[in-house]
Amino acid sequence: MIKKILISQPEPTSEKSPYFDIAKEYGVELVFRPFIKVEGLSSKEFRQQKISLLDFTAVVFTSRHAIDNYFKLAKELRINIPEDMKYFCVTETIALYIQKYVQYRKRKVFFGNTGKIDDLIPMMVKHKNEKYLVPLSSVHNDIVAKLLDSKKLNHKECVMYRTVSNDFTEEEAKAFDCDMLVFFSPTGIKAFTKNFPSFTQGDVRIA
C-alpha cells in the first residue's frame, strides 16, 4: 500500500495544486524534493564561448532560468544592458518575470500565448533586422536554431546555465522511506541513482 510519495519537483506555491487534492483524496503523504537544480555558468566559463552580450539587439527567453542567468552574467561582466534591448518570451508569465530586473514599461517585450517557440516566430520575423541571442541550458536540442534558420533570422545560441544533481544530505539519505518515486526527466533519474547507488526497487513504485 502506498502511503508516502516522493515528488522530484519543488513544492507547489499554490494551494490549488492538484497534488494536494490527490493527497487528500487518497490519504497519502507527498514529499517534494527536487533531484536536480539549475546552476548558472560563471563569467569565466561564459567568456569561453566568445560571445558579447552587447553584440545583440534582442534576447529570446524560454524560461525564468534564462532570464536570471542572463542578467546575472551581465552584472558579473559589468555590462549595462541598453534601454532599447528587445525581449521575446515564450509565455506572458516569463515576460512579466523580466520586471525583477528591469522596468517592464520601458522595454520592448513580446510574448507568445502557447508556450512554444513556434508562437514567437511571427513576431520575431516582424523584427527581422534584430540580432537575436538565445540563452540555453547545457542540455538542449537544436529546435530553436532550426526554426530561426528557416526564417533567415540573425541569431546565436549560447549556454548560460546547466542542470546538475541536487545531492541528498546524509540525513536525508538515511531517512528515505518512500513507497513511490515520481520522476519528470532522465536527468532526475540519473541524479537519484547517483545519490542512491545501491538502491533496489523492491516494492517501491516508480512513475
Question: Predicted regions span which residues?
Answer:
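Conserved beta-alpha
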Residues: M1-A207
